[in-house]
Amino acid sequence: RVDFIISEESEMLYFLNDYSEGAHEKVLQHLIDTNMEQLSGYGTDHYCETAKKKIKKACGCEDAEVFLLTGGTQTNQIVIDTLLQPYEGVVAAQTGHVSTHEAGAIEFTGHKVLELPQKDGKICAADLQKLVERFYGDENHEHMVFPGMVYISHPTEYGTLYSRKELEELSAVCREYKMPL
């Protein structure tokens, strides 16, 4: 857990999830200011369109499709299920969000969560490499859950961040085995 000090009086905000803290005053004021606007639903209003354009621009991909979803679990479930084949699973830290906090949402889609040991909430490239080598080294691997992608929480559930080097090392293993990270 990481505490973020926001004043000299040591008042702290705890970023445990997206619903444990209140909203910033400016956010609340904007909600008040726009409360009586009549908007179309399902992400087709001008606020959503503006957000989508900003995301495309930030990604440098103006022709991308952007879908706005309501929460992290739903987003993880949809992305993981979309990226994986039916026989593939997602590799994650034992403490990773998809391993512990999604109440089985990922496995509900039919994809197993393949857990790796963690240190401070992070997985390391060497452990990932061993898992994949062990999988492909097994003569019966075609009857097992394939490691199809790697999920990391950034920051982790411990509040730690992956270094650039750690991310590059994980990415190298993922690229070698053609697994999305």
Question: What do the PLM-derived regions correspond to, one by one?
Answer:
Residues G110-E157, L161-E169, E176:
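PLP-dependent aminotransferase-class I/II
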Residues D63-L84, L114-G121:
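Conserved core of the PLP fold type I
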